[in-house]
Amino acid sequence: MKFALLSLAAMAVASPVAIDVRQTAITGDELRTGPCEPITFIFARGSTEPGLLGITTGPGVCNALKLSRPGQVACQGVGPAYIADLASNFLPQGTSQVAIDEAAGLFKLAASKCPDTKIVAGGYSQGAAVMHGAIRNLPSNVQNMIKGVVLFGDTRNKQDGGRIPNFPTDRTKIYCAFGDLVCDGTLIITPAHLSYGDDVPSATSFLLSKV
């Protein structure tokens, strides 16, 4: 039953949403392939979402950061090793170890390639679990470079006590919409789980306040 609900939700997430800042020509691979910027945004998309940044919140936050700080932001999505498949939601960490390792590698790449950058990060749905798993075990010198993290529809919210373990709560903001049952430790998808595009302005403001 839960798997069927996840499948149904995945189709809804993959459907076109309002065409505004969410759908632009962003590759989401700017840390790997581009120059260092003062701010680096690392994001993990939700299950079945396309590209490296997905569609629900990743591109919106990326674009809003770029509009606020023109020429100062590099956006990097977690992938291609992280395939954002549905089945990985049922693993003990809420995602695959491969995905967690890839995300951790991107944080370490930002720290080594761009030692003066300020890192901000985010994740939606399964992508939030990716961020929990990656950030909690990073070396302290890399964690210290992460100034803010925003998580939407966090599938690890209840399991990890409303926070990313081993990471400061004042640098973390978790968005859990009223009625979104994944925030209560289930994988039951309700319409609320698809509403997080509305939180992009607030999330962007939070990240900007940290850099």
From Swiss-Prot:
PANTHER family: CUTINASE 1-RELATED, CUTINASE 2-RELATED. The record marks 47, 126 as: Transition state stabilizer. GO terms for molecular function: carboxylesterase activity; cutinase activity; lipase activity. This is Probable cutinase 1. It comes from the Eukaryota. Catalyzes the hydrolysis of complex carboxylic polyesters found in the cell wall of plants. Degrades cutin, a macromolecule that forms the structure of the plant cuticle. GO terms for biological process: lipid catabolic process. The active site is at 125 (nucleophile), 180, 193 (proton donor/acceptor). SMART domains: Cutinase (SM01110). Disulfide bonds join 36-114, 62-75, 176-183. Keywords: Disulfide bond, Hydrolase, Secreted, Serine esterase, Signal. It is found in: Secreted.
